[in-house]
Curated annotation (Swiss-Prot):
InterPro entries: Ribosomal_bL28 (IPR026569), Ribosomal_bL28/bL31-like_sf (IPR034704), Ribosomal_bL28_bact-type (IPR001383), Ribosomal_bL28_sf (IPR037147). Belongs to the bacterial ribosomal protein bL28 family. This is Large ribosomal subunit protein bL28. One of its GO terms (biological process) is translation. It comes from Methylibium petroleiphilum (strain ATCC BAA-1232 / LMG 22953 / PM1).
Length: 77
């Protein structure tokens, strides 16, 4: 599915634009997606993921090897 983080699963949300006159029109809040390449030391190759900024922080915290193994366990990579 388009515009969805491969790690966290975050996708677009729906909300309202609110004008000064308090008129409301529908809008979409899109996730901050980035294409990033990550080096897997164990496999000696690059992995390209479409991730949000929150997922980048998660990868910094737990490591790319752990994140990729979790994705493979879910069957998403």
């Amino acid at each position: 599915m388009a515009r969805v983080c491969q790690v966290t699963g975050k996708g677009p949300m729906v909300g309202n634009n609110v004008s000064h006159a308090n008129n409301k029109t529908k809008r979409r809040f899109l996730p901050n997606l980035q294409y990033r390449r990550f080096w897997l030391e164990t496999e000696n190759r690059w992995v390209r993921l479409r991730v949000t900024n929150a997922a980048l922080r998660l990868i910094d915290k737990v490591g790319i090897e752990q994140v990729v193994s979790d994705l493979r366990a879910k069957g998403e990579l």
